[in-house]
């Protein structure tokens, strides 16, 4: 009789552990699915769709106009957050090959950066008006003094700087892994932006 009680007790403990583990796993899966949905919708911000892309993790150095630059790997790119001036490029560059090998499209949400990993994303915020855009880094530049990023025409229009030509911005890196999970300084800002979104608008985007 005593043995049966012990067996029953052990079975009860085992079932409780399994139940807790299943609950935790289900919660994690739900959170991952919800995040994947938000990745699809860009957290309510205009720009390049946040999808898993291959990021060039190998660093290299190059020299241009008498100055040397060393690119950032994936881990270092995640920590990138800097303010400075943005410009944009289009016109004669439209249709040309970029540093990543892609053809530059002035109507796509892309950008050139001197060191961020090619294939990574960045959240660019216009400091003057607060407007944001998500861009994918597929080129190198700009190499003009005091410029930290060169936006495509579409990206410049999205943050209201097209007519000005130059604007002060904040650039924060975003990395999207193979499972659709985002990380980096830009990801932190996007999550804060999501929390500030109106409830009705948030629901519509989750659906």
Where are these regions (language model features)?
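Secreted/periplasmic proteins
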Residues: 22-207
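Bacterial N-terminal signal peptides that target proteins for export
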Residues: 1-9
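Bacterial N-terminal signal peptides
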Residues: 10-17
């Amino acid at each position: 009789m005593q043995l049966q009680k012990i067996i029953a007790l052990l079975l009860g403990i085992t079932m409780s552990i399994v139940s807790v583990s299943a609950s935790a796993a289900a919660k994690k899966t739900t959170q991952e699915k919800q995040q994947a949905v938000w990745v699809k919708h860009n957290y309510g911000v205009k720009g390049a769709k946040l999808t898993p892309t291959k990021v060039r993790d190998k660093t290299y150095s190059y020299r241009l106009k008498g100055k040397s630059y060393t690119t950032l790997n994936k881990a270092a790119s995640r920590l990138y957050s800097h303010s400075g001036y943005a410009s944009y490029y289009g016109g004669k560059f439209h249709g040309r090959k970029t540093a990543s090998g892609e053809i530059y499209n002035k109507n796509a949400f892309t950008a050139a950066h001197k060191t961020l990993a090619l294939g990574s994303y960045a959240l660019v915020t216009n400091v003057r008006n607060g407007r944001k855009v998500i861009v994918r880094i597929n080129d190198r530049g700009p190499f003009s003094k005091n410029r930290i990023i060169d936006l495509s025409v579409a990206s410049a229009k999205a943050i209201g700087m097209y007519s000005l030509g130059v604007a002060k911005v904040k650039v924060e890196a975003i990395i999207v892994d193979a499972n659709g999970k985002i990380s980096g300084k830009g990801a932190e800002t996007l999550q804060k932006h999501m929390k500030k979104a109106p409830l009705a608008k948030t629901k519509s985007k989750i659906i």
